[in-house]
UniProtKB/Swiss-Prot annotation:
Its main location: cytoplasm. Signal peptide: none annotated. ATP binds at K334. It comes from Actinobacillus succinogenes (strain ATCC 55618 / DSM 22257 / CCUG 43843 / 130Z). The keyword Aminoacyl-tRNA synthetase applies. InterPro entries: aa-tRNA-synth_I_CS (IPR001412), Anticodon_Met (IPR041872), Met-tRNA-synth_bsu_C (IPR004495), Met-tRNA_ligase_1 (IPR023458), Met-tRNA_synth (IPR014758), Methionyl/Leucyl_tRNA_Synth (IPR015413), MetRS_core (IPR033911), MetRS_Zn (IPR029038). This is Methionine--tRNA ligase. It comes from the Bacteria. A motif ('KMSKS' region) lies at residues 331-335. Zn(2+) binds at C146, C149, C159, C162. Coiled coil: none annotated.
Length: 685
């Protein structure tokens, strides 16, 4: 298929319908939207679809907690999600839901085809069951220690630390997220997709060279570990689609979620009379691309193409994987206000600022992207306001006042204009390969050249001298011509700024028409195209995020949910507010050796310690008497103490520090221990 005749379908991963969109989500959707808008500018037939992922136990349980039907919850969330995406100018052709008739039909069709082709197996499995809630526990409602890397607090289906996949019954020390109870094992008949049958096909797909190297390498690790049959069924109660021919079995959410790509596109096809089969038949020549995050690579690189192959449908042309978003070099934090919802951002800042910042830092690799808020302000103001928009404003005034808005009929510097046009192919290649950061750097280098041209020509000087009217018009027109080319190159990134620029230029910006300058052309009076970002806006957004997160935690819904807090969660004290590394560094924790320990007769709680710190001896009173009824046994052991705590005069003597212990109090207290070989006075780091 020639590039002039490309037919392309693009999807983003489906946001889960139980929470708001945040700036982490927006990275993927902005990345995909920039690529889609570029392809539209190139004249290709391209469709961009997405949907809410609306099935699964989490939605069922959250709706129950809220006292509403799951259908009402997902409808409300979908409306909110779509509003956020529209706010960031994400140009979906369709935004649907996996809880749709189209998705039900496709899910049943694919399942039936897989079954007819011999790729569905059934067998009884031992499954974790919550004895308190009388329900089988989905993978994501079991947590425990990863059986592979031993990372704690991992879900029942895969480890977020080492990316290993496993059965929930393999978890070490599993617990129910629903009730906190320790699950028991019960048998249930389940349906499995025979993934190992597709290993040869998947290996060939992996070796095709189309996939990102990081994806291909990760797939090879999974091949080396051995592919396993995939459990595609869940027991009732469950919110989703019932498996045909069963009474109480439902499709696992990860079976019908990617099928939602097809369902959303089918919904669009039905409304716009598009040929669906032309994009999804096995022999389709159309291009199909999925933009996803690195946390769901496994499903999209193994299960999804294998399901399509087994159902006699086409496979994706490629999956484009991105990393996570950090803020100021750290994971997004609710307490710090850096877990920023899309709706919160939109109340304080122009969405085009974030689109530009993300674009400036995006590559086609799976690298995490850091949203440094100080750099964000500086980059937006410098690049977009001081350089780009200023290029138009500093020339437009002369054109409007002195020449009635009419541009010159000849270029002042044809060679410079041609230099800008010559970069079109390179910039287009960067966009095509999703190297948006490189495209932006190339465009801003041209912007610097354009401003250098204006600075050297100094139209404000020419304007003061008689007889140089023609020169003034040509110089200022040249500045406008260069601005137009730059704005055309940035149109996929900044669609609204491009729209305002088109109104100012009174000409549409297309990739092809940029090669022809606007000679003897009338432009509109210049109006402000873009506003500077003030650091106070950032501060207000952060404070609003903190307040929103605090409100969620104290809302009636949260109180209702708190009443259902799991037994496991209620066993522990809540986390304190986050502190910085500098705050932590203020504490001087030291290893100390117990020289003597005795009960304080007049106190029911206190033991009196004499501690050797290596360089001095300290007396510490510690309220652990109930846990250590025979204090003499503590003599000679090592403990950890806070050594720089101000001495405190107590009723029974002076206490010169604090000994660290863990537990809920009373008899449930345990002194922290250290390995053999450590010396008294050693600092804990």
């Amino acid at each position: 298929m020639s590039k002039a005749n490309r037919q392309i379908l693009v999807t983003c991963a489906l946001p889960y319908a139980n929470g708001p969109i945040h700036l982490g989500h927006m990275l993927e959707h902005i990345q995909a939207d920039i690529w889609v808008r570029f392809q539209r500018m190139r004249g290709h037939e391209i469709y961009f679809v997405c949907a809410d992922d609306a099935h699964g136990t989490p939605i069922m349980l959250k709706a129950d907690q809220m006292g509403i039907a799951p259908e009402q919850l997902i409808a409300d969330v979908q409306k909110s999600h779509y509003a956020d995406f529209c706010g960031f100018n994400i140009s979906f052709d369709n935004y649907h839901s996996t809880h749709s008739e189209e998705n039900r039909e496709f899910s049943e069709m694919i399942y039936n085809r897989l079954k007819e082709n011999g790729f569905i197996k059934t067998r009884a499995i031992s499954q974790l069951f919550d004895p308190e809630k009388s329900m089988f526990l989905p993978d994501r409602f079991v947590k425990g220690t990863c059986p592979k890397c031993k990372a704690e607090d991992q879900y029942g289906d895969n480890c977020e630390v080492c990316s290993a996949t496993y059965s929930p019954t393999e978890l070490i020390a599993p617990r129910s997220v629903v009730s906190g109870a320790t699950p028991i094992i019960k048998e249930s008949e389940h349906f499995f997709f025979d993934l190992p049958s597709f290993e040869a096909m998947l290996k060939q797909w992996n070796r095709s060279g189309a996939l990102q190297s990081e994806v291909a390498n990760k797939m090879q690790e999974w091949f080396d570990a051995g592919l396993q049959q995939w459990d595609i069924s869940r027991d009732a109660p469950y919110f989703g689609f019932k498996i045909p021919g069963t009474e109480n079995k439902y499709f696992y959410v990860w079976l019908d979620a990617p099928i939602g790509y097809m369902a959303s596109f089918k919904n669009l096809c039905n409304r716009q009379n598009i040929d669906f089969d032309r994009f999804w038949n096995k022999d389709s020549q159309a291009e199909l691309y999925h933009f996803i995050g690195k946390d769901i690579m496994y499903f999209h690189s193994l299960f999804w193409p294998a399901m399509l192959e087994g159902a006699d449908l086409r496979k994706p042309s490629n999956i484009f994987v991105h990393g996570y978003v950090t803020v100021n070099g750290e994971k997004m934090s609710k307490s710090r206000g850096t877990f920023i919802q899309a709706a919160t951002y939109l109340k304080h800042l122009d969405p085009e600022c974030l689109r530009y910042y993300y674009a400036a830092k995006l590559s086609n690799r799976i690298d995490d992207l850091d949203l440094n808020l100080e750099d964000f302000v500086q980059r937006v103001n410098t690049d977009l306001v001081n350089k780009l928009v200023n290029l138009a404003s500093r020339n437009a005034g002369f054109i409007q006042k002195r020449f009635a808005g009419k541009l010159a009929d000849k270029l002042d510097d044809e060679a410079l204009f041609n230099e800008f046009i010559a970069q079109s192919a390179q910039i287009a290649a960067y966009y095509e390969n999703r190297e948006f950061g490189k495209a932006v750097r190339e465009i801003m280098a041209l912007t610097d050249k354009a401003n250098k041209y204006v600075d050297e020509k100094a139209p404000w000087v020419i304007a003061k001298e008689q007889g140089r009217e023609t020169e003034l018009q040509r110089v200022c027109s040249m500045g406008i011509q260069l601005f137009r080319v730059l704005m055309g190159y940035l149109k996929p990134v900044l669609p609204k700024l491009a729209e305002r620029s088109e109104a100012f230029l009174q000409a549409e910006l297309t990739w092809d028409n940029l090669t022809q300058p606007l000679l003897d052309h009338e432009i509109a009076p210049f109006k402000a195209l873009f506003s500077r970002v003030d650091s106070k806006q950032i501060e207000a957004m952060i404070e609003a995020s903190k307040a929103e997160n605090a409100a969620v935690n104290s809302s009636p819904k949260a109180e209702k949910t708190a009443k259902k807090t799991t037994a496991l969660e209620s066993e522990f004290e809540p986390l304190e507010a986050e502190i910085s590394i500098d705050d932590f560094a203020k504490m001087d924790l030291r290893v100390a050796k117990v020289i003597s320990c005795e009960a304080v007769p007049e106190s029911k709680k206190l033991l009196k310690f004499q501690l050797d710190l290596g360089f001095e001896t300290r007396q510490v009173l510690s309220g652990i008497k109930a846990a250590y009824g025979n204090p003499e046994e503590l003599m000679g052991r090592f403990v950890i103490m806070v050594a720089n705590l101000a001495p405190r005069k107590m009723k029974f003597g002076m206490s010169e520090g604090m000994i660290l212990s863990a537990g809920s109090g009373g008899e449930d207290l345990f002194l922290l221990d250290v390995d053999a070989g450590v010396k008294a006075g050693s600092r804990v780091k």
